[in-house]
Amino acid sequence: MAKILVTEDESALRMFVARALRLDGHETHEAGDGAEGLEMLSASQFDLLLSDIRMPVMDGIELAHQAAERHPGLKILLMTGYAEQRERADDLASKIVDVVQKPFALPDIRRAVAQALAQ
């Protein structure tokens, strides 16, 4: 299966999503903000970056820009609970697979990850 980096500042949600993806057979790693996520991306190769948009230190938009520039083959899937953040992600359309709206049900995020990995 895939090696996935879950970057989310809400620890309960981050652990919940990572655990669900592990149950699907994926190898997951977790980061609490964009800067930590970028460090982890530099240290290891991942198949998918699943990141919240609104985070401290470095937000998911900046993380996605830098990740796409440094790791061209990386698939990027963003998550947000804020409509205005989704609009901010529009300029990333060529660099990301999709934006998943929070709150989401577990089948929704699993489906989004499967679709992202299939592309």
PLM region spans:
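Alpha4 helix (beta4-alpha4-beta5 surface) of REC/receiver domains from two-component response regulators
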Residues: 62, 75, 82-100, 107, ...
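Two-component/phosphorelay signaling modules centered on CheY-like receiver
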Residues: 11-29, 116
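Active-site residues of response regulator receiver
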Residues: 52, 80
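Acidic, metal-coordinating helix/loop segments flanking the phosphotransfer/catalytic sites
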Residues: 29-48, 69
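Acidic catalytic/metal-coordinating carboxylates
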Residues: 33-36, 59-63
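Receiver (REC) domain active-site loop signature in two-component systems and cognate sites
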Residues: 55
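Conserved acidic carboxylate
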Residues: 8
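Acidic phosphotransfer microenvironment of two-component signaling modules
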Residues: 11, 32-36, 107
